[in-house]
Design a protein with these regions (language model features):
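His/Asp/Glu-enriched short active-site or ligand-binding loop at hydrolase and phosphoryl-transfer sites
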Residues: 208-221, 385-386
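Hydrophobic, small-residue-rich alpha-helical packing segments that form membrane-like cores
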Residues: 194, 199-208, 224
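Active-site and substrate-binding clefts of carbohydrate-active enzymes
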Residues: 2-59, 64-107, 223-528
Length: 528
């Protein structure tokens, strides 16, 4: 057996913006959550359980953001997800009949029927609609470390115009984590990996020990880190920073050379929501008749061609095992080369969006399972580790200030501040200043005034979500993103004036409390 010379640390960022529409039974954007549960969260949980049952000692870290936790805990969304699964089972049964004369497609339609039926059984009967407890279980037995995030994924480098709004994002993030996991989080995934040194004092105040940064956040730190991204640094403010490894990231992330582009893998963009006859598929697409992804996909990537071949489950499995072996060999070689120049074992940090695994890269959760099993059983020079474990083992670190950075395109603030969305920020900053004004002027509010102030805090936080700015920049669901910003700023502003005029509209307040029911324990005084 080779001597262990280093470590690999996987960090998956599980996040969705808070989307909750009790006014509609079929709101298109709520399907983002249902797809993530079926394609990412349940497959990850199934593979974690499989590894534990097989006696495989593995380690993985996940950030679970407060909006995601709030949605997973929401009773209405839980019932809507069950209805979503029942609808998918109904469609899958129709597909089994429709494809009876095509053996290859029929096999896949049976596969989808089995998968959605299994999801329903697991979610309803085994998990009792409680995915959070399932993830907590794996943290409690020591194979998973869960870390927190900003309250609504607000982008700190721009919000810091009013630093109290960043403090509130961190405070509510930590508070939400404690509510669901019963302990203090040691790490935080800074939203969009957006780092500025000024936030260290607030991270420290709320007990955060470490952050994840983009590669250049470490490489351009001051002074230059001796070991680059292969060892964490600690800021003068006492916050440990782990930087993303370039090589392992490209192997998974790259749209050109990354593993998810393998020709045997499932083609994300070919879905019966677009391919099937319109009248046939209409009951299963958006209520306004717009074609959308259903999750039933029969083709593999095949190549750079419009003529796609049918998806073959065994071929995809073979590619997974080959690529897990390739990643394993690359990390083995990388650590062999690096370790000889270091006086402590290197750590290769591999952070990714959780939704890459399963949603975008359908085979991703099985790839993790295959890789973790290989690391445990095969002869290699590294082990899996969490950032917290590495800090505990190797507490001595170089002191350096990470560079201002993000993991957005070009590495800084441009995705969230550019000509497509710059008009939003004056409204966010004005609302932030007004929230601080309210907290200062009404320190002892009670009754309906207190409820209105707490709702103001919720509306501000929801408006600050970086997701809306990202969507506007990318030009995807732009109308929805703009509507969400307008709604939350509008609700905040209306409440602000009602509080100032001492004329709070109880019906209006009740309505938005039901719609924007995130963070029930929030205390507006965090903005003082």
């Amino acid at each position: 057996m080779q001597k262990k010379k280093g470590y690999v640390s996987f960090v998956l960022h599980a996040h969705l913006p808070f989307i909750h529409h009790p006014e509609s039974d079929d709101y298109l954007e709520e399907s983002w959550l249902y797809e993530a549960i079926s394609e990412t969260y349940i497959p990850l949980l199934k593979n974690f359980k499989k590894l534990v049952d097989e006696g495989v000692d593995f380690r993985i870290t996940m950030s679970m953001t407060p909006p995601l936790l709030s949605m997973l805990d929401n009773k209405l969304l839980q019932q809507k997800y069950i209805k979503y699964l029942e609808r998918m089972i109904e469609l899958s049964k129709k597909e089994v009949k429709r494809t009876a004369k095509n053996e290859q497609v029929n096999k896949l339609s049976h596969y989808y029927l089995d998968r959605y039926s299994s999801d329903l059984h697991l979610y309803k009967d085994v998990f009792k609609c409680d995915l959070i407890s399932q993830f907590k279980h794996f943290q409690d037995i020591g194979v998973l470390e869960i870390i927190t995030c900003g309250a609504t994924h607000g982008f700190f480098p721009i919000l810091y115009v009013n630093e109290k709004t960043v403090k509130a994002q961190i405070a509510v993030g930590v508070q939400t984590y404690k509510k669901y996991f019963g302990k203090q989080p040691r790490g935080i995934w800074l939203p969009e990996c957006g780092y500025i040194p000024e936030v260290d004092k607030y991270l420290k105040e709320f007990g955060i020990e470490y952050i994840i940064t983009e590669t250049h956040g470490i490489l351009y730190a001051d002074p230059t880190p001796v070991y680059g991204t292969f060892a964490p640094i600690v800021s003068p403010g006492g916050i440990v920073a782990f930087g993303r490894d370039i090589g392992s990231s490209r192997q998974v992330w790259s749209s050109v050379n990354g593993y998810p582009g393998d020709y045997n893998y499932r083609e994300f963009y070919r879905d019966i929501g677009y391919d099937a006859d319109y009248d046939y598929i209409k009951p299963y697409i958006a209520h306004n008749g717009v074609r959308v992804h259903t999750g039933i996909k029969y083709y593999r990537i095949t190549g750079k061609t419009e003529n796609k071949d049918y998806y073959n489950l065994q071929w995809a499995k073979d590619s997974v095992e080959r690529q897990a072996g390739h990643f394993f060999d690359c990390r083995n070689m990388q650590i062999e080369n690096i370790s000889q120049y270091m006086n402590k074992p290197p750590i290769i940090l591999c952070p990714y969006d959780a939704e890459l695994y399963g949603h975008w890269w359908y085979e991703g959760p099985y790839w993790l399972y295959t890789l973790f099993k290989k690391i445990y059983y095969d002869d290699c020079n590294f082990k899996l580790i969490t950032p917290s474990e590495y800090i505990d083992k190797y507490p001595e670190m170089q002191v350096a200030t990470p560079c201002r950075s993000s993991w957005g395109a070009n590495g800084y603030n441009g995705v969230w501040l550019n000509p497509t969305n710059d008009y939003v920020h004056k409204h966010l900053h004005t609302a932030g200043d007004r929230m601080c004004e309210l907290a200062q002027n009404y320190p002892n509010a009670k009754g309906i005034q207190q409820k209105a102030l707490n709702q103001c805090a919720r509306e501000l936080l929801l408006a600050q979500s970086s997701d809306w700015l990202f969507i506007i920049t990318n030009g995807t669901m732009v109308d929805y993103a703009k509507k969400r910003i307008k709604d939350h700023i509008g609700r905040f502003t209306k409440l602000y004036h009602q509080i100032k005029d001492n004329k709070i509209d109880k019906d209006f307040l009740k309505d938005i409390e039901e719609k924007d029911c995130v963070f029930p324990e929030i205390d507006y005084r965090i903005y003082k």
